[in-house]
Amino acid sequence: PYYKENNVDIFGVESAGEGIASGKHAATLTSKAPIGILLGARSNVLMNNDGQINESFTEASGLDFSGVGPEICYMASIGKIKFLATTDKEARETFLMMCRKTGILPAIEACYVIHATLKEIKKRKNPKENHLIHLCGSGESNVARMLKYKRDNE
């Protein structure tokens, strides 16, 4: 419903995987991927110079896709949605922070959004702004992997 509002900023968040410069990511719009055809839809697609689809890379299976839907691509092209990217490492750190500070076990996919939103809030420094994050899913299936990450990085 907010896409018609002029005083509302809408952000999408993509997985930067190991970093956009590494080429191992799923950040189709953030990396300025070209227009191509994927699954019959014309939209931005991660692909090589020959037009072959590149494999996307991210820890979050729900974000692991080489393209973006055409409606989202259009809204990004006219500036209605701004895209940000979060690395897998930043998402893992956000998962651990959310567990520690709130007791919430967010789905790993949600952690990309939480990280980018917190970063954007810090950048704006406007206490009168309201921020809405749409989250879904549960991180129960991510707990073992995140605990291993925590142990390996202590």
Predicted regions and their residues:
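Short glycine/serine/threonine-rich phosphate/pyrophosphate-binding segments
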Residues: 1, 20-22, 110-117, 141-143
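Anionic group-transfer/hydrolysis microenvironments
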Residues: 16, 111, 136
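A short, acidic, amphipathic alpha-helical segment used as a generic capping/interface helix at domain edges
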Residues: 88-93, 113-124
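Active-site/ligand-binding loops adjacent to catalytic centers
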Residues: 12-104, 148-154
